[in-house]
Swiss-Prot record:
Keywords: Electron transport, Membrane, Mitochondrion, Mitochondrion inner membrane, NAD, Respiratory chain, Translocase, Transmembrane, Transmembrane helix, Transport, Ubiquinone
Source organism (scientific name): Hylobates lar (Lar gibbon)
GO biological process, one term: mitochondrial respiratory chain complex I assembly
Compartment(s) of residence: Mitochondrion inner membrane
GO cellular component: mitochondrial inner membrane
GO molecular function: NADH dehydrogenase (ubiquinone) activity
Annotated function: Core subunit of the mitochondrial membrane respiratory chain NADH dehydrogenase (Complex I) which catalyzes electron transfer from NADH through the respiratory chain, using ubiquinone as an electron acceptor. Essential for the catalytic activity and assembly of complex I.
Transmembrane segments: 1-21, 25-45, 55-75, 96-116, 123-143, 145-165, 178-198, 200-220, 237-257, 274-294, 324-344
Protein name (database record): NADH-ubiquinone oxidoreductase chain 2
Lineage, highest ranks first: Eukaryota, Metazoa, Chordata, Craniata, Vertebrata
Top enzyme class: translocase
Keyword Magnesium listed: no
InterPro entries, alphabetized: Complex_I_Subunit_2, NADH_DH_su2_C, NADH_UbQ_OxRdtase_chain2, ND/Mrp_TM
Similarity comment: Belongs to the complex I subunit 2 family.
């Protein structure tokens, strides 16, 4: 990518998300989504190879299809109500079409098939943007239209996303695909609580962004894209090795780490609203998600090499520049739940 084009591309991505999140007019919302989509395609093809080109084409086709469905829903609602504002959605069919389009953009099941493939086909940092920043615009629309969304369909999408995200990551050895399936699971948790308490959805999104950013930055610092490369990271950056397991466990939602806090709030909110079976099923299914993170940790830090003679030891480690971002994120990843009683005092 041309260095002169990078500020323009990233500014357009930021502007598109900002326009969508701050607009109450459907046309401006759709324009912001299109700006965001078109500007993100060069980010996916930062490294020109057949795999990144394939990922960019898949991303474009899925997002264009979702935008077309969303525009059809907007126009049908306008024909029936005569309004362009997001608060005036009177047709149930239009709201269902909007929900399907936004679920496709978010990568929720059963529209999730593009997320692992696109994430695998791009770089780690581009995958980080795909799984974090690109969620903001669709979730901001969902936040505004949730009063008219069919709750049963949204809960079905959420539970299916948690199931697919948990089962899909079991047989993966590519770390980007594992994080992509983890993203599908987290989106399912966010959307499950949206009709009952949208503020918990926003809090869940913030925690998810912190956890995913920490994981991607740690893997990028190690240049680890597979479980095999991650298991050899002890010979590259020894100081990072003890921190990766805590990050992965927090991403899987193990108490008392930070990743359990949003799940705790979601389960509490759903239980208050009389849906005891749904949060119980969600918690049980998410244990599968925690299992393949435990498997990653086992292959990374618990197992020892059978013989040290077969491994080339580095006599000089890489001189990495010190950064305050990763240690700060690591602290938030592990210590936010223990201070939660101070942050969320009980009445």
């Amino acid at each position: 990518m041309n260095p002169l084009a990078q500020p323009i591309i990233y500014s357009t991505i930021f502007a598109g998300t900002l326009i969508t999140a701050s607009s109450s007019h459907w046309f401006l919302t759709w324009v912001g989504l299109e700006m965001n989509m078109l500007a993100f395609i060069p980010v996916l093809t930062k490294k020109m190879n057949p795999r990144s080109t394939e990922a960019a084409i898949k991303y474009f086709l899925v997002q264009a299809t979702a935008s077309m469905i969303l525009m059809m829903a907007i126009l049908s609602n306008n024909l029936l109500s005569g309004q362009w504002t997001m608060a005036n959605i009177t047709n149930q069919y239009s709201s269902t079409m909007m929900l399907m389009a936004l679920a496709m953009k978010l990568g929720m099941a059963p529209f999730h098939f593009w997320v692992p493939e696109v994430t695998q086909g791009t770089t780690l940092m581009s995958g980080l943007l795909l799984l974090t920043w690109q969620k903001l615009a669709p979730i901001s629309i969902m936040y505004q239209i949730f009063p008219v969304v069919n709750v049963n369909i949204l809960l079905a999408f959420s539970i299916l996303s948690i199931m697919v995200g948990s089962w899909g990551g079991l047989n993966q050895t590519q770390l980007r695909k594992i994080l992509a399936y983890s993203s599908i699971t987290h989106v399912g948790w966010m959307m499950a609580v949206l009709p009952y308490n949208p503020d918990i959805t926003i809090f869940n999104l913030i925690i998810y962004i912190v956890l995913t950013t920490t994981a991607f930055l740690a893997l990028n610092l190690n240049s680890s894209t597979t479980t095999l490369l991650l298991s050899r990271s002890w010979n590259k950056l020894t100081w990072l090795l003890p921190l990766i397991p805590s990050t992965l466990l927090s991403l899987g939602g193990l108490p008392p780490l930070t990743g359990f806090l949003p799940k705790w709030l979601v389960i509490e909110e759903l239980t208050k609203n009389g849906t005891l079976i749904i949060p119980t099923a969600m918690a049980i299914i998410t244990l599968i998600n925690l299992y393949f993170y435990m498997r990653l940790i086992y292959s990374t830090s618990i197992t020892l090499l059978p013989t040290s003679n077969n491994v080339k030891m580095k006599w000089q480690f890489e001189n990495t520049k010190p950064t305050f971002l990763l240690p700060t994120l690591m602290t938030l990843t592990t210590l936010l739940l223990p201070i939660a009683p101070l942050t969320f005092p009980t009445p």
